């Protein structure tokens, strides 16, 4: 043991202490500073002086580490305890609890109904365009194009069930093969995860809540994307899903059965049908190539109609077209016969708001889209507020322990699989994975459910929605039973394969880590969440679809270099993180690139500038030009004019001008509490200088 243990880690590097420390600081503990601020000689001690080398404060004092933002918050009960209430207070508390529970159910009901109306609004806005995507059979044979078509169509109609029913109809009519339909099913699985991502945006008010909520929503996205990246090439090379589902259909003799029970629809349909009703057969007719369906409206007008079959005299080209010789005659000019003519007679109109309006589908869709988003946002805010007021103290502790605690050893590994079964069962009950994951998102945001527990619940919801599709396929007519059942089984085994890839082994649970990383970025730069939503669900699929229209050579020529570049960046990032010593000094960080290529800070400055364009005296053009120059330059010496800088940036520059030195061999690096408080900004500047932003854009 060293004779001076407090000097074991001393580094004889002169000039490390902060300039202005003119002498040794007192060894009096920081908590006694207020009582005595003199050293051993009785002279006043400067606030920036260092402790003497013989002080053991550095060995005793424990510096509190930063709290993990992913830790579930402690929901403390700040109200009056139950034991301290009188009879009147207890009665009032009971009525308040019952009232909050009723309000919670009411807002949850409106939340689910707004999701249904939102789906109808998306179908009115983009349903016909989605049907036209399916009508181009030459593009559908391309697996990559089929994948992005599935994403775009499901995003537009906000329902994987609708897109799946269109695919089943096309396969049953021999317009599409099962092999070509499998990539579309994979794309539909990705597109359905946009709903809970939109819901997570509503919690952007609080950074920590938004961090958890957005990560909990995007864990579904990353699971679907990663599964597609692995299984789509595998399916294109081996066709294992097609072969496996064929084997299942040949082994088991399936017969027509009853449809899946509509438990949630029974509750929500009476309300949503008063707002809007759609004729979803129009989208299927457009996808089947019926040109007459282009002029039809998706808004359902007549709900009751009867079919009359009457005998009528009709003209035919010749006697060969007559129904029978006895029912055929001619008047010298035309040939007549008697035929049964079927006429559809409308009896009663539907009872919804837009039944008597002559507005086009696009206008009605925009109105419903705006209203449903407002209601969705309001309901979500109220649900979060009510849950935050109810889930306090012992109630929150019990719920969090129930949801997030594992089974005792050695059965802890079974907890996640039980959560998968729970997620599948709940999704089967509500008949929609979007509803289940969207309802779970605010619970993740307020800290009731952890990301690690939300992940298996989300995987279970993927399984639950496919079991619903299988039951719906069993209720299909005889001519479409096999095709619809095979499509549903392909969807089922695709999700099972994804779970086998990304869940059983803990280190393969990449969606959790990726979602947490995206949650951290989105919490710091909240505009990035909107960018992620637009880029990955609209821009990328539309770009790939446009390249697919140009043919395979163009798609490969543009796509392969981009994929190789992304793989190169990923490999370099892994080497920087795991074993940077094997890399050249220049490649150990991203500072060799311009700042705008490896950091979101310049982009954040541009967006902040765009949102506060007219709040300062400096003209907008001057500020934009100055900021763009600094962004492109990436040099630390580059400075904008004073009028273009924020006040915070000017203060930060003043802090960065403080010279820094290292302590000598016999200088204690520990500072008193008072000195730490005074120099907190300086230490933060030092740490910011030491760390480089490795966020690759």
Swiss-Prot record:
Q: Which cysteines are joined by disulfide bonds?
A: 303-350
Disordered, as annotated region: 1-45
Question: Where's it mainly located?
Answer: membrane
TM segment ranges: 92-112, 137-157, 214-234, 364-384, 409-429, 487-507, 527-547, 552-572
Per the record, its GO cellular-component terms are:
apical plasma membrane; brush border
Domain of life assignment: Eukaryota
According to its UniProt record, which reaction does this protein catalyse?
3 Na(+)(out) + phosphate(out) = 3 Na(+)(in) + phosphate(in)
Q: Which residues lie on this side of the membrane: Cytoplasmic?
A: 1-91, 158-213, 385-408, 508-526, 573-696
Write out the function statement from the record.
Involved in actively transporting phosphate into cells via Na(+) cotransport.
Could you identify this protein by its name?
Sodium-dependent phosphate transport protein 2B
Q: Which organism is it from?
A: Mus musculus (Mouse)
Its lineage reads: Eukaryota, Metazoa, Chordata, Craniata, Vertebrata
């Amino acid at each position: 043991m060293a004779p001076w243990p407090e000097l074991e880690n001393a580094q004889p590097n002169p000039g490390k202490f902060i300039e202005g420390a003119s002498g040794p600081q007192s060894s009096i503990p920081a908590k006694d500073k207020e009582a005595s601020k003199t050293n051993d000689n009785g002279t006043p001690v400067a606030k920036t002086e260092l402790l003497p080398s013989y002080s053991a404060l550095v060995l005793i004092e424990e510096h509190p580490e930063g709290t993990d933002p992913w830790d579930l918050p402690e929901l403390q009960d700040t109200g009056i305890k139950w034991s301290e209430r009188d009879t009147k207070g207890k009665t009032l508390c009971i009525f308040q609890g019952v009232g909050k529970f009723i309000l919670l159910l009411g807002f949850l009901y409106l939340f689910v109904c707004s999701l249904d109306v939102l789906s109808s609004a998306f179908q009115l806005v983009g349903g016909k365009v989605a049907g036209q995507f399916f009508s181009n059979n030459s593009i559908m044979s391309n697996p990559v194009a089929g994948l992005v078509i599935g994403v775009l169509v499901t995003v537009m109609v906000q329902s994987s069930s609708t897109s799946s029913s269109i695919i089943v109809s096309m396969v049953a009519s021999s317009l599409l093969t099962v092999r070509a339909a499998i990539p579309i099913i994979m794309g539909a699985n990705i597109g359905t995860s946009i709903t809970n991502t939109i819901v997570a945006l509503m919690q952007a008010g609080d950074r920590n809540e938004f961090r958890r909520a957005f990560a909990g929503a995007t864990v579904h996205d990353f699971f679907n994307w990663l599964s597609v990246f692995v299984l789509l090439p595998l399916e294109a090379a081996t066709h294992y899903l097609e072969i496996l589902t064929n084997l299942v259909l040949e082994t088991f003799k399936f017969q027509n059965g009853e449809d899946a029970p509509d438990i949630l629809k029974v509750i929500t349909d009476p309300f949503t049908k008063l707002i809007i009703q759609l004729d979803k057969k129009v989208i299927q007719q457009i996808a089947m190539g019926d040109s007459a369906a282009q002029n039809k409206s998706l808004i359902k007008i007549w709900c009751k109609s009867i079919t009359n079959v009457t005998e009528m005299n009709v003209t035919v080209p010749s006697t060969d077209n007559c129904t029978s010789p006895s029912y055929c005659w001619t008047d010298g000019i035309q040939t007549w016969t008697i035929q049964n003519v079927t006429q559809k007679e409308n009896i009663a109109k539907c009872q919804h708001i837009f039944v008597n309006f002559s507005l086009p589908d696009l206008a009605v869709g925009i109105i419903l889209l705006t209203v449903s988003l407002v209601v969705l946002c309001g309901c979500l805010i109220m649900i979060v507020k009510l849950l935050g007021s109810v889930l306090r103290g012992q109630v929150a502790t019990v719920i969090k322990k129930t949801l997030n605690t594992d089974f005792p050893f050695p059965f802890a590994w079974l907890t996640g699989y039980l959560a998968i079964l729970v997620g599948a069962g709940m999704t089967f009950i509500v008949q929609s994975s979007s509803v289940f994951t969207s309802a779970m998102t605010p619970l993740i945001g307020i800290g009731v459910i952890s990301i690690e527990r939300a992940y298996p619940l989300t995987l279970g919801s993927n399984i639950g929605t496919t079991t619903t599709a299988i039951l719906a396929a069993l209720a299909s007519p005889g001519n479409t039973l096999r095709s619809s059942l095979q499509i549903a089984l392909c969807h089922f085994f695709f999700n099972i394969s994804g779970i086998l890839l990304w869940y059983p082994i803990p280190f393969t649970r990449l969606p959790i880590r990726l979602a947490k990383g995206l949650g951290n970025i989105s919490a710091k730069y909240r505009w990035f969440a909107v960018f992620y939503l637009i880029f990955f669900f609209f821009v990328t699929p539309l770009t790939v679809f446009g390249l697919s229209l140009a043919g395979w050579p163009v798609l490969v020529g543009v796509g392969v270099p981009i994929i190789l570049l992304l793989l190169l960046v990923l490999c370099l990032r892994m080497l920087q993180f795991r074993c940077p010593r094997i890399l050249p000094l220049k490649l150990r960080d991203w500072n060799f690139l311009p700042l705008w290529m490896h950091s979101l800070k310049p982009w954040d400055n541009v967006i902040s500038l765009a949102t506060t364009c007219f709040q300062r005296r400096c003209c907008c053009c001057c500020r934009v030009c100055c900021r763009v120059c600094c962004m492109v330059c990436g040099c630390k010496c580059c400075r904008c004019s004073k009028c273009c800088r924020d006040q915070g940036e000017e203060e930060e520059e003043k802090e960065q001008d403080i010279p820094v030195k290292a302590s000598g061999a016999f200088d204690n690096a520990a500072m008193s509490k008072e000195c730490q408080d005074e120099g907190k900004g300086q230490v933060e500047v030092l740490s910011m200088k030491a760390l480089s932003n490795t966020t690759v854009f």
